Amino acid sequence: MTVLTIEEMAETLAPRQAIAGLDLGTKTIGLSMSDLGRRFATPRTVIRRVKFAIDAQALLDFAQSEKVAGFVIGLPMNMDGSAGPRVQATRAFVRNMEQKTALPFVYWDERLSTVAAERTLLEMDVSRAKRAERIDSAAASFILQGALDRLSLLARSDGDEFSA
């Protein structure tokens, strides 16, 4: 497993490979998936965290069943750009995943992703109970969509045949 920049991931991905977005929390891991064209992020499921070995296996099972080519994981930065208190835990999670998978990870600034997800769910008139169930996968979707937008921009600037 390697930690890549988004630019490095753009170079390593083959056409029509999906990537997953992760919103790592203390109690849950929100998951989202891209389409094969890597244009759209869709909220998927939430893994209830137990302990690392169980969490990692659940994530790897998801990756295998969805044919994931890589992960974009939210990095919880402070608004001033400094490392937030959960950055160290996120980096440790990825370091531990190095022992479990060869799939690459990209860190993606997740500032305001949960706020944006909450706002979207409110606008969709989702009940409070349903919002609580869906917020983590929705936040993962916002994280992944940001990375997908960047990948699309990189493809256009390279004259990639798959760009819009």
From Swiss-Prot:
Molecular-function GO term, any one: nuclease activity
Main location as per UniProt: cytoplasm
UniProt-listed InterPro entries: RNaseH-like_sf, YqgF, YqgF/RNaseH-like_dom, YqgF/RNaseH-like_dom_sf
Pfam families in the cross-refs: RuvX
Cellular compartments annotated: Cytoplasm
Claim: Transmembrane is one of the keywords in the record: no
Keywords: Cytoplasm, Hydrolase, Nuclease, Ribosome biogenesis
Signal sequence interval, chain numbering: none
Role, per record: Could be a nuclease involved in processing of the 5'-end of pre-16S rRNA.
Protein's name according to its UniProt entry: Putative pre-16S rRNA nuclease
Organism: Rhizobium johnstonii (strain DSM 114642 / LMG 32736 / 3841) (Rhizobium leguminosarum bv. viciae)
